[in-house]
Amino acid sequence: MTRSPFRRLVFGTLRRLLYLWVRSETINQSSFTLNLDRSRPVFYVLQNPSLTDLAVVDTECTKAGLPRPVLPVSVGSLIEPAAFFYLTPDPDWLGRQDKRGAPPTLTRLVSALSQNAAEDAQIIPVSVFWGQSPDSENSPWKLLFADSWAVTGRLRRLLSIMILGRKTRVQFSAPIHLRELIEHNKGHERTVRMAQRILRVHFRNLKAAVIGPDISHRRNLVKGLLNQPLVKQAILDEAERENISPEKAKAQALRYGNEIASDYTYTAIRFLEVVLSWFWNKIYDGIKVNHIEGVQKVAQGHEVIYVPCHRSHIDYLLLSYLLFRNGLTPPHIAAGINLNMPVIGSLLRRGGAFFMRRTFKGNPLYTSVFNEYLHTLFTKGFPVEYFVEGGRSRTGRMLQPKTGMLAITLRSFLRSSRMPIVFVPVYIGYERVLEGRTYLGELRGASKKKESIFDIFKVIGALKQRFGQVAVNFGEPIKLAEFLDSEQPGWRQQELGPQFKPAWLNETTNRLGEKVAQHLNEAAAINPVNLVALALLSTTRLALDDRAMARVLDLYLALLRKVPYSPHTTLPEGDGRALIEHVKDMDLLSEQNDALGKILYLDEQNAVLMTYYRNNVLHIFALPALLASFFQSTSRMSREQILRYTRALYPYLQSELFIRWTLDELDAVIDQWLEAFVEQGLLRFEKDVYLRPAPSSRHFVLLTLLSKSIAQTLQRFYMTVSLLLNSGQNSISAEELEDLCTVMAQRLSILHGLNAPEFFDKSLFRHFIQTLLDLDVLRRDEAGKLSYHELLGELAEGAAKRVLPAEIRLSIRQVALHRSEDAADQVAPPVQND
């Protein structure tokens, strides 16, 4: 085709005509060009013969300044008329293809390189996608639309160009060095076959990652669920249990399948992309995506399960949009059945949502159908997304994982581990969450309202506000097989039973949930709003002068750069003053001028709302804040003392906030933080002792502000232990203690003017009590009453003296004592008068 000037002229004319309509872009171009050796000859390989694909590749190479595929290239003494070839050879004049034959260009290259050991050639697989969609229907009309696994001819390609040509994506993959294959010394023919096999596997895996694996259409998929052994048995059990015919039970199972299954279509995905592109540009100043390269790599050859944090109803829309824009298949998304409503539910279903009931209890047939549907998605390699937190976090904290979906995933993998599963944590960080106003009531302590898609319409009136930027950070993937190998060695050889529910399933699932939550927190995107909230909420009056505020923010940034929380955590750009201006522009920060300068403060509404953004990053500052707390009541501490008290308190902070470090790693991390404190002037180190600055110094003020960020958490811990100790051994249940703690916290928040609803959040007390039980600090007797270790009081008071001011400890003890006396009066017998 390119052997003569005439053919080059024809090709150039075709390319220009094609681009009167077609618009193309390259996926992940930067990571590809980094791996390219410009000093070595480059050959492009396309999977199937296509002049239009070649024209698109040639255009993208020209745009990127890469060698063009249609120009001659030399390898030693070999001169090839063009720098491309097709993995599947051109058809003969009857239209027949010999798919087993080797491309002549590849054969000549291997021969030339075998004769010249100094030469090499880079083979770059290139894929052109005319739209992205899984082949979810077999109707002739839909086969005309997007790239799929079906084999179709020139008519379909023509219509694909007409319909989807303006959404064409090109994927350049990492170069394959032919020299490395030749050095295996397999001989000419075996080397050619090896290269062909590598390329075939590569194209198959890439296609699955970009357009999704091959699945049957929805009706056949749902009907197929009913023919699986576990579902067939569940149908028979349902018929016997409900005293109905097997046909009626099967019809019910079919209704469940139709209620659950998604109806994934390219049309809906493309519609959502257009709408969401407008929406993001309308309300956000930008969307930053970090570390997606690792996902693009792991998506090939793995069943990917995205596990994002859940802060807003738009989380799943944002993630699907970004995956689609970055050349990855949007996942099938687990959605609550409350979202399956007219119009909205249909659109979500076509966008990949499958619906699940909030509880499966008492409905084994539904459970079986749902589990089988997920198992089908997993084993076919279709990406899936679900939220391990269950509902949206109204407080900004990472919620305790709901392990139901994780357990279903684990059981599916135990049933068939042929397709390796990898969990991809996704942290979504908002500078202003869209539902912020609707969260205000709950942040002030009102009861949680039932979730509804209509929540999103309540924010329409707030769209005139500035919402800043959104950061989407992809965390470190968790490979399920490796996790099971570490948690349950030999799991592959174990007898798992017909239901695939080994005795260790619940405990292992809980640990998997904790690991996912920790990896999510590791990927946190720290933004200016988080840091401003952290600083101002640590002050007594929620105010600082602008210079002091800038110093605090600069300190936080310096500490985080000195001791990075994790490689996946991201920091904002700019210094403290730039961060202040950014938050002021978003109307989250108020300003007052006087003769001495500017005062920055939070008004009443923003003060409550900013607790949400502070809580987003509390896990990152918990350990340094704890270390700073030690020096509020003492001027000097040895390293041994610091390590001792930190190790005593850390397990409870780690459990509540999902902090990443293990106890074995803790000492080294503490040393890093202490070194950073000394470097920033927050501490001095003299004669093996750490000394705090003078109380009147600027550095002591900074140290105190840092310590305040964790103060309320430590107060809750001390409050719980004080109530328990005052109640005595075996006299109160966990539920009663939880209720007492909640009431006491509400009272203390009024007495001390605390404006933080999570201070009296019952679930936090419940989790702390459970952690005490898990660590054997507490035990339950047969009646459910709690007993505690005899050293608990001494340890609690010793640690409390180090981290809590005397007036706070006294106030907590007084309220706890009065509460115990009131309880004693209620159970004491009445006094008999003669």
Curated annotation (Swiss-Prot):
Coiled coil ranges (UniProt) are none
Q: Which UniProt keywords apply?
A: Acyltransferase, Cell inner membrane, Cell membrane, Lipid biosynthesis, Lipid metabolism, Membrane, Phospholipid biosynthesis, Phospholipid metabolism, Transferase
Top-rank EC class of the record's enzyme:
transferase
Principal subcellular localization? membrane
Q: State any single GO MF term.
A: glycerol-3-phosphate O-acyltransferase activity
Q: Which InterPro entries match?
A: GPAT/DHAPAT, GPAT/DHAPAT_C, GPAT/DHAPAT_LPLAT, GPAT_PlsB, Plipid/glycerol_acylTrfase
Does Cell inner membrane count among this protein's keywords? yes
Its GO biological process annotations read: CDP-diacylglycerol biosynthetic process; fatty acid metabolic process
Q: Per the record, GO CC terms?
A: plasma membrane
Q: Which Pfam families match?
A: Acyltransferase (PF01553), GPAT_C (PF19277)
EC number(s) stated in the UniProt entry for this protein: 2.3.1.15
Location of the protein in the cell: Cell inner membrane
Membrane topology qualifier? Peripheral membrane protein
**Which reaction(s) does the protein catalyse, per the Swiss-Prot or TrEMBL entry?**
sn-glycerol 3-phosphate + an acyl-CoA = a 1-acyl-sn-glycero-3-phosphate + CoA
Q: Where is this motif: HXXXXD motif?
A: 309-314
The UniProt entry's sequence similarity note says:
Belongs to the GPAT/DAPAT family.
What's said on domains?
A: The HXXXXD motif is essential for acyltransferase activity and may constitute the binding site for the phosphate moiety of the glycerol-3-phosphate.
Which PANTHER family is this protein grouped with? DIHYDROXYACETONE PHOSPHATE ACYLTRANSFERASE (PTHR12563:SF17), GLYCEROL-3-PHOSPHATE ACYLTRANSFERASE (PTHR12563)
Task: Specify the protein name.
Answer: Glycerol-3-phosphate acyltransferase
Q: Which gene encodes it?
A: plsB
